[in-house]
Amino acid sequence: LTQTDFVNGIRFENTGDTKISLDDIRVNQLVDYEMEAVTIPEGAEDYIVGMNVCSLWRNGEHTGWATITPYEDIRPVLGYYDEGQPQTSDWEIKFLAEHGVDFQAFCWLGRESDKPIKQAWDITALDNGFLPAKNKDKMKFCLIWEAANGATPVDRDAFRNYFVPYWMEYYFSNPSYMTIENKVVFAVFGADSLISKFGTGLKAEFDYLREEVKKLGFDGAIILDCNSYRTEGSASYGFDGWYAYNWGQQGCYYEANVTLNLKAKEDN
């Protein structure tokens, strides 16, 4: 039977025999706008190309635009856009997809370590921009768990009871989430903070994540260590591979990163 519930003046109505259950409510204002069609270039399917996205441009959540406005040569193509708006994300999707980019990897920073997660930190670009965008079916997304600066679970129970369910409900279950061979793609930045906490037990937690996503119909997860210096031992912590976060002056040089890491160890 159709059921209607009212919570804080908001009406929720099911269809058929679907049961209504609520654990959190997010309300966004929907503003209609015209959007140009996305034209995927020929040959774009020959490779899978992804791009790290570091969403730092919403005033009040991070440094905002004041950091770069003095430098006109790095002014964005979109101008100083309002991050976290669907229309902004639609233009980003259009520009990226039409230049052969298949998915965006968004940084995800936790707020809580030992309690249910209500909202991540600095995630407006994904939650309020990309996910409601009209063109999101033209591009996939995945998460980079930013464990270097965001909150990390206090123990395995917190990881399994708070972090994993949150990712599954809000992201992995989304049809736009990036998969390879029906496995969700999931990266970790700042894995050292997790390794220092869990040790080789980190592998058991990642294996738990792989099993949990099967409940959503996936065949597991591909978990990547986002670093440019740890080339051995990643598998013992549960990683399937590793990659460099950036391709700047040092990020693109494997030998340079290894040398810098060895020097840092010697200095310490």
Predicted segments, located by residue:
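Noncatalytic modules at the cell exterior or secretory-pathway interfaces
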Residues: 2-12
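Glycan-processing catalytic domains of CAZymes
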Residues: 13-15, 19-22, 28-268
